[in-house]
A protein has these predicted regions:
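Rhodanese-like catalytic fold shared by cysteine-dependent sulfurtransferases
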Residues: 1-21, 25-144, 148-281, 285-395, ...
């Protein structure tokens, strides 16, 4: 692939079947405002942490995108140093793409939202409006309401009386709540997608119960003037032996009807041995507690509902081999079925799950592994540190995420997004001989940033040892708020419900009208960062 990729060449690459990755290096708010459909949001500052897991094969063709190509050119040497051998830059960036009247889309996780709307229309998912559900709750209707989002989202605010049951757990656990065939099951989320996918997962079970999705979820509930329940703790009950047997039977039926492929533990281990030359994702779709207790070595935690809700957060190479794993194969098979309907060509589930993996001699890891940061050790060897305490007249620069900076930073610290450090540092420290101290929460991102400043010619750069956490631990004072932003805080995007009524209304209009290419006649409100 050419080092400079024209818009036409990128369009041809993305419409083909050869494995490739297209990485948008801008920050999340800029990506939300407009991006090329099916590209992966990977802010430049996260390359060292996330890229090895997103693109495992170093020979994969990779195209870097930003607004005008300048950020991509800054990032290209990093990828080369990491061993990626086929890296191109979109000539002229998104500006050139748009100049040729090529389309862009708004929003985050757009492929998943498109799929949710497709599910609604193709399978005609039954729906209930928020006012109607409120009336049914007030009238004491016999029904079970489940929230298919993450436990954290559920706890922040759910439909009154709802149980937490993330989408990937519905088929396994719904029988623990529903005791009669005439009980209505209501599935809700924050908006639309996860309600529809969750309801359709239950409908595939063949239950006699009425299964209905709540139209517009918790946002619709609030827009209707209704109050959410805050701090609920009705967690999904553990699955019984009967529930497991039912889920296994449903999975067996879906495997046959959908023509799904199972792979053995030995086959997965062979794939893992080739992951440096053939892209591979192994996703464990169970709960966080189950994953932490023990999972196949190398598997990434991707709970089933979120793996469908946020596809582009988990993978960057659509042609890669994807393997789903769980404890007995049932939840993994259901995730595989959804990805097949999404059009992924190389998908499979681990037959027999974790027990089969361990029986075959596969290594098991526990906890949630902290991703290695490429280049961090080398950067540490080349930069000096300073202990918490008096920093003298040094210029203090924070490269934390902006929301972390707002919560606590060293007094006087200027905030710069690390993705744009080279182009912003001159406004904060124009004298390259001046002492500079770089900070972040724990010292990792600041170490990488300090190494960059050294390459730029800053001769007296140090890193705050242990980061702001160590600073606070030493009893030093901190500042809060946007005291000295030296860059646009576009790295954090608030949810529509965090932005207010107008943002929620705009979001729901936008999502409902999405076409199969991620386009909508309705616009989202401009993305907002944590500073607003």
């Amino acid at each position: 692939m050419s080092a400079i990729v024209t818009p036409a060449a990128l369009g041809a690459l993305m419409s083909g079947t050869a494995p490739h990755a297209v990485l948008d290096l801008r920050e999340r708010a800029a990506y939300e405002r407009g991006h090329i459909y099916w590209t992966t949001s990977l802010p430049r500052r996260l390359l060292e942490t996330r890229l090895p897991g997103l693109v495992t094969a170093r020979s994969t063709p990779i195209v870097l995108i930003d607004e005008d190509g300048s950020l991509s050119e800054l990032a290209r040497p990093t990828l080369a140093a990491m061993g990626y051998t086929d890296v191109g830059v979109l000539a002229g960036g998104l500006g050139a793409w748009r100049a040729e009247n090529r389309s862009t889309v708004q929003g985050l996780n757009v492929p998943s939202k498109v799929f949710g709307e497709r599910a609604l229309h193709e399978w005609k998912t039954p729906q209930v409006s928020c006012p109607d559900l409120a009336k049914r709750i007030a009238g004491g209707d016999d029904m079970v309401i489940v929230d298919s989002r993450t436990p954290e989202e559920y706890h922040r605010g759910c439909i009154p009386g709802a149980w937490s049951m993330p989408g990937g757990e519905l088929v396994l656990r719904i029988g623990e709540l529903v005791k009669r065939p005439d009980q209505t099951i209501i599935v809700h989320c924050g908006g639309r997608t996860r309600s529809y996918i969750g309801a359709e997962s239950l409908r595939r079970m063949g239950l006699p119960n009425p299964i209905i999705a709540l139209e517009n979820g918790t946002m619709g509930w609030q827009l209707a003037g209704l109050e959410l329940e805050r701090g609920a703790e009705r967690w999904a009950p553990p699955p019984s032996s009967r529930g497991r047997a039912v889920a296994a039977e449903v999975a067996k039926r879906i495997v046959k009807s959908d023509g799904l492929r199972g792979v053995t533990a030995a086959q997965v281990r062979d794939m893992q041995g080739r992951r440096a030359v053939e892209n591979l994702y192994v996703f464990d779709v169970r709960t966080t507690e189950e994953y932490a207790a023990g999972h196949p070595a190398g598997a990434v935690w991707a709970p089933g509902g979120q793996a469908v809700q946020a596809i582009d957060d988990y993978l960057a190479v659509r042609g890669a081999q994807i393997v789903f794993a769980c404890d007995d194969g049932s939840r993994a098979a259901l995730s595989t079925a959804w990805y097949k309907r999404l059009g992924f060509p190389n998908i499979a589930y681990l037959e027999g799950g974790l027990p089969a993996w361990t029986a075959a001699g596969g290594d098991v890891e526990s906890g949630h592994p902290v991703p290695a940061v490429w280049g961090l050790d080398a950067a540490r060897a080349g930069v000096a540190t300073v202990a918490p305490g008096a920093l003298g007249d040094a210029v203090v620069v924070s490269v934390d995420p902006s929301d972390v900076y707002l919560r606590a930073h060293v007094p006087g610290a200027a905030w710069i997004c690390r993705s744009r450090l080279e182009t912003r540092i001159g406004g904060v420290a124009p004298d390259r001989a001046r002492a500079v101290v770089v900070t972040c929460a724990d010292g990792a991102q600041s170490t990488l940033a300090a190494a960059t400043l050294g390459r730029l010619g800053y001769s007296s750069v140090r890193v705050l040892a242990g980061g702001v956490r160590a600073w606070q631990g030493a009893g030093q004072p901190v500042e809060t708020g946007a005291t000295r932003l030296a860059d646009e805080a576009d790295d954090i995007v608030l949810k529509p419900y965090e932005r207010g009524r107008a943002a929620m209304e705009a979001y729901l209009r936008w999502e409902e009208a999405l076409d199969m290419e991620g386009r909508s006649p309705h616009a989202l409100l401009p993305g907002t960062s944590a500073t607003r």
